[in-house]
Swiss-Prot record:
Homotetramer. It comes from Arabidopsis thaliana. NCBIfam families: PRK00009.1. The keyword Ligase does not apply. The gene is PPC2. This is Phosphoenolpyruvate carboxylase 2.
Length: 963
């Protein structure tokens, strides 16, 4: 029996192998990695749930692969009938299996990419496709490229040490994988990497194989579904875990690589440790826009938590540094200080190392011992404040400023250099100094974000209380006049007797929390929906009134298309106010939002408007002599401004970055950017290299005739997009039927509600669920809608325009990136799948609507390829094509399962014939039956809700971008 079994399994696996795409090149290990993980997974599935379940999963895979090969829609129906015949327990097991197999395919892909990079480093550059625009910027290659463009090494070094990239981590509700699983995936990745190492012994191999099996099984046995929504504190802790695991050690490691790259172009200096190359900020616990769960208490907790973590991370490293610093030779300044501290030392028995008095011939250790005491106290103070709000640790026993913390470390550094021990100084001590300069005492700077309307409410309460009228009814000029007269005066505006609604109290309490915490805990105060100068002045006034001694910089955020268009004028009006110019000291930051502008007008018009707005803003800033920093609020998906980092940076308009870049790293992208050490390194390298290159070798400015054509196309694209999304009276109804948008809220991804207002149409829906829903059905409507109409109309008007579009694609980075990203989305899309959702879920009279959209999809795809000069989608990127082909059968199965399950949830009259349970030994306590019990509170038939949520998570993993 066992032998026959094995034979049968092998033959099915052989069949599966035939369905997999072929290798692309010598360096292509992807098929092997994928096969290994898949085999391990199927063996585990058979052990846990029996042979029939394994066979069923393989049959589903084959039917789906068959559909992906020839797009025969009958196969989708066959697959649908197979999946709906399962009982609730089996349905969850099968869905979970496909979701897991997809995650494993993603891991195989990551290991393959890392492997090819290593090979490329060893072979150095014989990859034709690696040189194309789709690869990232290696710091060393970037420096060499700049020298080829006739920059001197000194100019490059000067630009590099003066630039800043500030990465702002946000807890957008799109990280749909639980942390428990992310950690297991990390270990699977490690096992896989080691298994294919050259010098591996048979014993090692066997142990690694066992570890691999163990981790795959542990991941499969973990409940993928969050049963309760995360709180903002949970999101913050999840975000902070990346500092712990990769970013903390990753920054000094990356800066060493920059030093090496500089050495290779003839610069024998290191990047100064206080050069602010990389900075980190966060929105977790500070972003209250539309999230009532972020209260002033949350903001306070999050700041104290980050300070405690920072002190803890330094503390865990300081003893290692003390071990290294055993030298006796030092300069006079240090010797005097060390002697003074050695004599004043109390015993330190609660430390593990160096607990007795430090001997006189170890002066560095005496200095660092004092630093250790202060770090211990700093951590304790933050911990006590966090748990009870009070602390018995006096303030003079802790570090209160970064300069105070750097001073003894700088003293050690100077002393070593004075005594000829520079190589020692440039070891761990330099790394430590760089960490202190990058992370400070606060670990990350917290941005506060609030809607402009909420500030107006507070001021309205104040003016009404003062009896001078209603602030909200005043004109913009009157508001400005009053705000400026108050800002120039000294009198307090209101006392404790101000009558406050809950909302007003919340805004004022937030300012109060800011005034009570150390100012280095905070970054910017961002005002969403900002339209006028009074929005900014209002925040300046409230900061002063609430006693914030070191006010946060105020950053207006422009999101909707109309706001972007009027942003330059609004900023010019702001700069024309003398009081404000004196306040900002020649520096201003402006944030531009990608998600809402895309939802508002479609991708083409939004991208072009963002481009033009940045150019205009830079002009305005130059006119007033202000240095402008653009803060890019990009999402993870293409519909929300996502896409490969280096390309996005290099396609920004010339002069808009100037060595200062601030950009959000959102939810699901945090894991892709910082989940592993090598990913963290790559992310820091990409941002730094691309920012440097953009500043020193800016992309070309578009020719005047390109601009005219873009303007024309943007108008047509907006018109087409809005005619469907906003003007079509039954569009919202169609959207809610054709996608899982209504079910999205059950995923418990984020702490933020998915709608701004409970009822209402597309306007009130957040940009994230809007895109999430279209990504699920693989129709990606918000990304491509508008492109087709625009291309078609300008080509019909004048056939020469086609050649101009081709010229734009070949010569203008911005246009190329915009088109390439849409092409990538077409590679992941499948109108056949969208048609299946329509057929099952959309009422008959709305069916033609979907058909029309699918015709538009195909037409847009055809025109896009024509403009790009490609015969087929992704013909220039065989690797990406192969990777997408590998994933397709898994995603197709999950899509079919989702569509049919939604049908069962929404249509009580939809009857299915359930087949007997797959595992022979079925009883109430079997593994499959227990899965159904994980969700006892569901309002649907057993198992349906979990099945839908699992398909959502699986498809999100397959698309590699959720919202």
């Amino acid at each position: 029996m066992a032998a026959r079994n094995l034979e049968k399994m092998a033959s099915i696996d052989a069949q599966l192998r035939l369905l997999a795409p072929g290798k692309v090149s010598e360096d292509d290990k992807l098929i092997e990695y994928d096969a290994l993980l898949l085999d391990r997974f199927l063996d585990i599935l058979q052990d846990l749930h029996g042979e029939d379940v394994r066979e069923f999963v393989q049959e589903c895979y084959e039917v789906a692969a068959d559909y992906d090969g020839n797009r025969n829609t009958e196969k989708l129906e066959e697959l649908g009938n197979m999946l709906t015949s399962l009982d609730p327990g089996d349905s969850i097991v099968v869905t979970k299996s496909f979701s897991n197999m997809l995650s494993l395919a993603n891991l195989a892909e990551e290991v393959q990419i890392a492997y090819r990079r290593r090979i490329k480093k060893l072979k150095k550059g014989d990859f034709a496709d690696e040189a194309s625009a789709t690869t990232e910027s290696d710091i060393e290659e970037t420096l060499k490229r700049l020298l080829q463009l006739n920059k001197t090494p000194e100019e490059v070094f000067d630009a590099l040490k003066n630039q800043t990239v500030d990465l702002v981590l946000t807890a957008h509700p799109t990280q749909s994988v639980r942390r428990s699983l992310l950690q297991k995936f990390g270990r699977i990745r490690d096992c896989l990497t080691q298994l294919y190492a050259k010098d591996i012994t048979p014993d090692d191999k066997q142990e690694l194989d066992e570890a691999l099996q163990r981790e795959i099984q542990a991941a499969f046995r973990t409940d993928e579904i969050r049963r309760t929504p995360p709180t903002p504190q949970d999101e913050m802790r999840a975000g902070m875990s990346y500092f712990h695991e990769t970013i903390w050690k990753g920054v000094p490691k990356f800066l060493r690589r920059v030093d090496t790259a500089l050495k290779n172009i003839g610069i024998n200096e290191r990047v100064p440790y206080n050069a602010p190359l990389i900075q980190f900020s966060s929105w977790m616990g500070g972003d209250r826009d539309g999230n009532p769960r972020v209260t002033p208490e949350v903001t306070r907790d999050v700041c104290l938590l980050a300070r405690m973590m920072a002190a803890n991370l330094y503390f865990s490293q300081i003893e290692d540094l003390m071990f290294e610093m055993s030298m006796w030779r030092c300069n006079e300044e240090l010797r005097v200080r060390a002697e003074r501290q050695r004599c004043a030392k109390r015993d330190a028995k609660h430390y593990i190392e160096f607990w007795k008095q430090i001997p006189a011939n170890e002066p560095y250790r005496a200095i660092l011992g004092d630093v250790r005491d202060k770090l211990y106290n700093t951590r304790e103070r933050a911990r006590q404040l966090l748990s009870s709000g009070v602390s018995d640790v006096p303030e003079d026993a802790v570090f209160t400023s970064v300069d105070q913390f750097l001073e003894p470390l700088e003293l050690c550094y100077r002393s070593l250099c004075d005594c000829g021990d520079r190589p020692i100084a440039d070891g761990s001590l330099l790394d430590f100094l760089r960490q202190v300069s990058t992370f400070g005492l606060a670990l990350v700077k917290l941005d506060i974000r609030q809607e402009s309307e909420r500030h107006s409410d507070v001021l309205d309460a104040i003016t009404t209380h003062l009896g001078i009228g209603s602030y909200k009814e005043w004109s913009e000029d009157k508001r400005q006049e009053w705000l400026l007269s108050e800002l120039s005066g000294k009198r307090p505006l209101f006392g404790p007797d101000l009558p406050k609604t809950e909302e007003v109290a919340d805004v004022l309490d937030t300012f109060k929390v800011i005034s009570e915490l150390p100012s280095d805990s905070f970054g910017a105060y961002i005002i969403s929906m900002a339209t006028a100068p009074s929005d900014v002045l209002a925040v300046e006034l409230l900061q002063r009134e609430c006693g914030i001694t070191d006010p946060l910089r105020v950053v207006p955020l422009f999101e909707k298309l109309a706001d972007l268009e009027s942003a330059p004028a609004a900023v010019a009006r702001l700069f024309s106010i003398e009081w404000y110019r004196n306040r900002i000291n020649g520096k201003q930051e402006v944030m531009i939002g990608y998600s809402d502008s895309g939802k508002d007008a479609g991708r083409l018009s939004a991208a072009w408007q963002l481009y033009k707005t940045q150019e205009e803003l830079v002009k305005v800033a130059k006119e007033y002599g202000v240095k402008l920093t653009m803060f890019h609020g990009r999402g993870g998906t293409v519909g929300r401004g996502g896409g490969p980092t280096h390309l996005a940076i290099l396609s920004q308009p010339p002069d808009t970055i100037h060595g200062q870049l601030r950009v959000t790293v959102q939810g699901e992208v945090i894991e892709q950017s910082f989940g592993e050490e090598h990913l963290c390194f790559r992310t820091l390298q990409r941002f730094t290299a691309a920012t440097l290159e953009h500043g020193m070798h800016p992309p070309v400015s578009p020719k005047p005739e390109w601009r005219v054509l873009m303007d024309e196309m943007a108008i047509i694209a907006t018109e087409e997009y809005r005619s469907v999304v906003f003007k079509e009276p039954r569009f919202v109804e169609y959207f809610r039927l054709a996608t899982p948008e209504l079910e999205y809220g059950r995923m418990n991804i984020g702490s933020r509600p998915s709608k701004r207002k409970p009822s209402g149409g597309i306007e009130s829906l957040r940009a994230i669920p809007w895109i999430f829903a279209w990504t699920q059905t693989r129709f990606h409507l918000p990304v491509w809608l508008g492109f087709g109409g625009a291309f078609k109309r300008v080509i019909q008007k004048d056939s020469k325009n086609l050649n101009m579009l081709k010229e734009m694609y070949n010569q203008w980075p911005f246009f190329r990136v915009t088109i390439d990203l849409v092409e990538m989305v077409f590679a992941k899309g499948d109108p056949g799948i969208a048609a299946l959702y329509d057929r099952l879920l959309v009422s008959e009279e709305l069916q033609p609507f979907g058909e029309q959209l699918r015709v538009n999809y195909q037409e847009t795809r055809r025109l896009l390829l024509q403009v790009a000069g490609h015969k087929d989608i992704l013909e220039g990127d065989p690797y990406l094509r192969q990777r997408l082909q590998l994933r397709d059968p898994y995603i197709t199965t999950l899509n079919v399962c989702q569509a049919y399950t939604l049908k069962q949830i929404r249509d009580p009259s939809f009857h299915v014939k359930v087949r007997p349970h797959l595992s022979k030994d079925y009883m109430e306590s079997s593994p499959a039956a227990e899965l159904v019990k994980l969700n006892p509170k569901s309002e649907y038939a057993p198992g349906l809700e979990d099945t839908v949520i699992l398909t959502m998570k699986g498809i999100a993993a397959g698309m590699q971008n959720t919202g």
